[in-house]
Amino acid sequence: MALDSAKKAEIVAKFARKSGDTGSPEVQVALLTTRISELTGHLKINKKDFSSRLGLLKLVGRRKRLLKYLKAKNYESYTKLIAELGIRDK
């Protein structure tokens, strides 16, 4: 379920704060969102793949923590990111 390097580089370039930025919360959330959507599609086909379901829950939890951090530190960037990714605000 890993992303190929070309797609990952495209996402990093789109959400990076500056050139070479791979660790900012915006980039991490965007990468996690892409992985979550791909894994969700996999689980719609393979309903009994419980180990992948557990991995999906871990990814969602990690994304939730990063979004909580981003909301506390930089609310403007948070609102822009969730609008661009199509994520609901709690």
Swiss-Prot record:
GO cellular component: cytosolic small ribosomal subunit
PROSITE patterns: RIBOSOMAL_S15 (PS00362)
UniProt GO molecular function: rRNA binding; structural constituent of ribosome
Alphabetical list of Pfam families matching this protein: Ribosomal_S15 (PF00312)
Xref: SMART domains: Ribosomal_S15
CDD domains on file: Ribosomal_S15p_S13e (cd00353)
Keywords from the named record: Ribonucleoprotein, Ribosomal protein, RNA-binding, rRNA-binding
Membrane-spanning intervals of the chain: none
The keyword DNA damage is annotated on this UniProt entry: no
Subunit text: Part of the 30S ribosomal subunit. Forms a bridge to the 50S subunit in the 70S ribosome, contacting the 23S rRNA.
Family the entry assigns: Belongs to the universal ribosomal protein uS15 family.
UniProt protein name: Small ribosomal subunit protein uS15
